[in-house]
Amino acid sequence: MDVTIQHPWFKRPLGPFYPSRLFDQFFGEGLFEYDLLPFLSSTISPYYRQSLFRTVLDSGVSEVRSDRDKFVIFLDVKHFSPEDLTVKVQEDFVEIHGKHNERQDDHGYISREFHRRYRLPSNVDQSALSCSLSADGMLTFSGPKVQSGLDAGHSERAIPVSREEKPSSAPSS
């Protein structure tokens, strides 16, 4: 008995009456031309999502660097002002929270909120932590590391966010 193996491209019926991916799990991402034309979207594999890379880039990508003498977090928060951001250290974690109320943009009204939590290395001097926001929207949280025999000072405290007028020197990933 011969069994025909079909490529995923041919598993979806073609036609204007077949439901497209308009109501799938990517509901909040917005619509693209291939979402509105079911014939075009079904000629591409149904498991292929063209906008995933764009979504990752727009989601506030962060970079953590921990070298021998310094710990640094770079976080893209270009849609937030320093007043919208709260940075605090609690025990061995830094928590960064951003929230802004409804604002008008090119497509209507939008509100945003995020919460990030990072574990601090045990040898970071928590009394010398700093946080700044560059003109291009890059939040930089940094702290020096201490020698392993010294106390790093673990307690809860808020870190003020200062604004810089120059763009960030963090490399884009």
Curated annotation (Swiss-Prot):
GO terms for cellular component: cytoplasm; nucleus. The modification Deamidated asparagine is found at residues 101, 123. The modification Phosphoserine is found at residues 45, 122. Residues 145-173 are annotated as: Disordered. Keywords: Acetylation, Chaperone, Cytoplasm, Eye lens protein, Glycoprotein, Metal-binding, Methylation, Nucleus, Phosphoprotein, Zinc. Gene3D superfamilies: 2.60.40.790. Zn(2+) 2 binds at residue 107. Residues 153-167 have a biased composition (Basic and acidic residues). Acetylation at Lys-70 may increase chaperone activity. Heteromer composed of three CRYAA and one CRYAB subunits. Inter-subunit bridging via zinc ions enhances stability, which is crucial as there is no protein turn over in the lens. Can also form homodimers and homotetramers (dimers of dimers) which serve as the building blocks of homooligomers. Within homooligomers, the zinc-binding motif is created from residues of 3 different molecules. His-100 and Glu-102 from one molecule are ligands of the zinc ion, and His-107 and His-154 residues from additional molecules complete the site with tetrahedral coordination geometry. Contributes to the transparency and refractive index of the lens. Acts as a chaperone, preventing aggregation of various proteins under a wide range of stress conditions. Required for the correct formation of lens intermediate filaments as part of a complex composed of BFSP1, BFSP2 and CRYAA. This is Alpha-crystallin A chain.
